């Protein structure tokens, strides 16, 4: 069978604070090192403004009910305000700088890796479907020890759509040949994961305390 996992707060505990000054000081430094007269407070304000503006445009286009933005574009927008420019690599780098400075907690839940291994030995295929930014999430998956855990994954920033939009689920199904009749979604969020799975026509496990805390229920799926 195919089991689809969310990542953040399902397999790994994460807590980030984008409002504290320590988050934006290294971002200011990043721009200044490239000749742009940025200030941490101004960059933080621009980040929020440009994010909302770009997301509003995506919503107006109407392609998806729940569109997703590639956040690296926001950092390119910010550079233009200061008369500069960032290429794709630099935009991803400054996003990782901001993210790294914002992280308070990032760790795999105890027992999560063991759960995935048990599912694998029982013949399950494992997939990841996450509302996440590719610029930093793939690195965080590696840091938490899950780099080789999945048969495939999709991140919302790479697809332009996010959970609970059923189209995001269907993209995963189509790319990896997942059978929606037997697939199960495991996630901590009732709306995005459980509600999204229902909209896509698949079963789900609401792992509100993380997947490892619901290991018995998840493992039981492979016995049916």
Predicted regions located by residue number:
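Asp-based, Mg2+/Mn2+-dependent phosphohydrolase catalytic module
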Residues: 1-5, 13-17, 32-41, 89-91, ...
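N-terminal helical cap/lid subdomain that shapes the substrate entry/recognition surface
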Residues: 1-110
């Amino acid at each position: 069978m195919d089991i689809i996992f969310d990542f953040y707060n399902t397999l790994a505990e994460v807590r980030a604070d984008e409002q504290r000054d320590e988050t934006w000081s290294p971002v200011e430094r990043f721009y200044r090192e490239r000749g742009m007269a940025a200030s941490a407070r101004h960059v933080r304000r621009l980040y929020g403004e440009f994010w909302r503006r770009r997301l509003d445009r995506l919503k107006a286009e109407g392609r998806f009910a729940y569109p997703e933005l590639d956040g690296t574009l926001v950092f390119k927008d910010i550079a233009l305000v200061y008369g500069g420019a960032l290429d794709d690599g630099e935009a991803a780098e400054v996003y990782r700088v901001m993210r790294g400075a914002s992280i308070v907690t990032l760790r795999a839940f105890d027992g999560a890796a063991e759960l995935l291994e048990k599912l694998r030995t029982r013949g399950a295929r494992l997939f990841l479907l996450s509302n996440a930014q590719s610029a930093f999430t793939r690195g965080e998956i590696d840091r938490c020890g899950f780099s080789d855990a999945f048969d495939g994954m999709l991140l919302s920033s790479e697809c332009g759509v996010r959970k609970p939009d059923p189209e995001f689920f269907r993209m995963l199904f189509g790319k990896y040949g997942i059978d929606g009749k037997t697939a199960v979604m495991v996630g901590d969020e009732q709306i995005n994961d459980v509600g999204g799975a229902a909209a896509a026509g698949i079963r789900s496990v609401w792992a509100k305390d993380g997947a490892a805390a619901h290991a018995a229920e998840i493992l039981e799926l492979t016995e049916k």
